[in-house]
Amino acid sequence: MPELPEVETVRRGLAPVLEGARIAQAAVNRPDLRWPFPDNMAQRLTGATVTALRRRSKYILADLDTGETLLIHLGMSGRMQISGDVIGSFHHTHPAAAKHDHVVLDTDAGARITFNDARRFGAMDLMDTATQDQHWLLRDLGPEPLGNAFNEAHLVAAFKGKRSPVKTALLDQRIVSGLGNIYVCEALWRAGISPLRQAGKIAAVRVATLVPIIRDVLTEAIEAGGSSLRDHRQATGELGYFQHTFRVYGREGQRCQTPDCAEKILRKVQSGRSSFYCPACQR
C-alpha cells in the first residue's frame, strides 16, 4: 500500500494540473471501489473548481469551490494518471480507456486525470470542507510526521508506558499519521533501535532521535519519487526509485550495510507485517 512519500509524490504531480482547474466533466464508471461512491459523485464534481490539493496522512484531499472536498485513497494498486494537454512541458495524448479506469476527470484546460485501480482497494468520497476533520477516515489521525506537531515531546509522551513493540507503535496512525512498513523499518535501522523493543522501555533520549530520522527518511523518499515495489507510479507514469537505497527493507539474508557489521538482515512477522532489521546494530 502506498505510504506517505508515494501519496505526496502523486499529490505533487497532480497539483500543477488540478489546482485552479475547473472539472469540465467527471465520469464514474462503477458504483464502488472499496466502499460505495457518494451519491451523484460525477454530477457533484462536474463544474467544480479545485481550489487546493492537499495531503493528510495517506489521503489526497482536493478542496472544491462548491464547499466540498474530494478525498482520494489509492489503496493497494490505485494510480492517478495524467494525460492531455498540460503537464509542464510534456504532452500526453489521452490513452484508450483501460479495464480498471474507474473515475475520469477532464479539466477545462484539456488535461485528463484517471483513477485506475485493478484491485479496487482504493476509495473516493466527498465531504463538507468545513467539517472534514470529523470524517471517519480523518478524525482519529495523529500529527503529520513532517509537521511541527510531531516533535520529540509528543513521541516521548506517546510511548510512555506503551507495551507494544516500537514498530507497532509507529504504525499506529493515532500516534503519527502516514507512516507505513517500509519507512518505519528504514528509520529504526538508522536509529539503531530494534523493531521488537517494547516502546515504553526505550529511553526518552533514544525515542527523541526518531523524530529527525523519520523526517529525513520521508524527505529523501519524496525527493526520490517514492518506492516502486509493485504498483506505485508517479502521476506522470514514472517510477519512484527510493527502493534502490533501502538499507534493510526487503533485504533478508543480505549483509547489513553498517560499516564493519558482518551480520545479515533478519525478517520477522509482526502484526501481519514483515519487519527487517539487523540483530547486531539494532537493540
Curated annotation (Swiss-Prot):
- Catalytic residues in the record: 2 (schiff-base intermediate with dna), 3 (proton donor), 58 (proton donor), 273 (proton donor)
Output the PANTHER family linked to this UniProt entry.
Answer: FORMAMIDOPYRIMIDINE-DNA GLYCOSYLASE
Cofactor comment? Binds 1 zinc ion per subunit.
Q: Name one GO biological process term.
A: base-excision repair
**Reaction catalysed by this enzyme:** Hydrolysis of DNA containing ring-opened 7-methylguanine residues, releasing 2,6-diamino-4-hydroxy-5-(N-methyl)formamidopyrimidine; 2'-deoxyribonucleotide-(2'-deoxyribose 5'-phosphate)-2'-deoxyribonucleotide-DNA = a 3'-end 2'-deoxyribonucleotide-(2,3-dehydro-2,3-deoxyribose 5'-phosphate)-DNA + a 5'-end 5'-phospho-2'-deoxyribonucleoside-DNA + H(+)
Keywords, in A-Z order: DNA damage, DNA repair, DNA-binding, Glycosidase, Hydrolase, Lyase, Metal-binding, Multifunctional enzyme, Zinc, Zinc-finger
The similarity annotation says: Belongs to the FPG family.
Give the Enzyme Commission number: 3.2.2.23, 4.2.99.18
Assembly and partners? Monomer.
CDD domains hit by this protein: EcFpg-like_N (cd08966)
| Binding, DNA | 100, 119, 162
Q: What does this protein do?
A: Involved in base excision repair of DNA damaged by oxidation or by mutagenic agents. Acts as a DNA glycosylase that recognizes and removes damaged bases. Has a preference for oxidized purines, such as 7,8-dihydro-8-oxoguanine (8-oxoG). Has AP (apurinic/apyrimidinic) lyase activity and introduces nicks in the DNA strand. Cleaves the DNA backbone by beta-delta elimination to generate a single-strand break at the site of the removed base with both 3'- and 5'-phosphates.
Gene3D superfamilies linked: 1.10.8.50, MutM-like, N-terminal
Q: Where are the zinc fingers (FPG-type)?
A: 247-283
Entry cofactors:
Zn(2+)
One annotated GO molecular function is: zinc ion binding
Please name the gene that encodes this protein: mutM
Please identify the protein, giving its name as recorded: Formamidopyrimidine-DNA glycosylase
